[in-house]
Amino acid sequence: MTMTDPIADMLTRLRNANAAYHETVAMPYSKIKAHIAEILQKEGYIQGWRVEDARVGKNLVVTLKYGPTRERAIAGLRRVSKPGLRVYAKKDNLPRVLGGLGVAIISTSSGLMTDKEAKKNGVGGEVLAYVW
């Protein structure tokens, strides 16, 4: 069976592994998931990510990040634009997550970027997810 929303699947796997204090979480690889993982690492929400070749297909393995007293780096993840209801934002209406404390991941014509980068570059796009 095909997956309807692979990005939502990725976010759910991250959310569940984070709640259970797992060190790593594996998921099927795609370029967009790798770009999302890159953004999460750059913003300090995950420790790292790598691509593993399995016999059947590639896997994206994400290493989660926790503080010294096991506090989670990711407090929340939310999928915004879904296959049934797409959400777009113009450059003047880019969302702010928790008043600027969180990050919105936006798919633009210039690639995936955070809300701050999109505002700096003056581009809008599809709002994929919120991370805080």
Swiss-Prot record:
PANTHER family the UniProt entry points to: 40S RIBOSOMAL PROTEIN S15A
A GO CC annotation given for this chain: ribosome
Matching Gene3D superfamilies: 3.30.1370.30, 3.30.1490.10
MF terms in GO: rRNA binding; structural constituent of ribosome
Protein name in UniProt: Small ribosomal subunit protein uS8
Similarity comment: Belongs to the universal ribosomal protein uS8 family.
Complex and partners: Part of the 30S ribosomal subunit. Contacts proteins S5 and S12.
Source organism of this protein record: Thermobifida fusca (strain YX)
Function, as annotated: One of the primary rRNA binding proteins, it binds directly to 16S rRNA central domain where it helps coordinate assembly of the platform of the 30S subunit.
Keywords: Ribonucleoprotein, Ribosomal protein, RNA-binding, rRNA-binding
GO biological process: translation
The keyword Ribosomal protein is annotated on this UniProt entry: yes
This protein's record includes keyword Ribonucleoprotein: yes
Superkingdom of origin: Bacteria
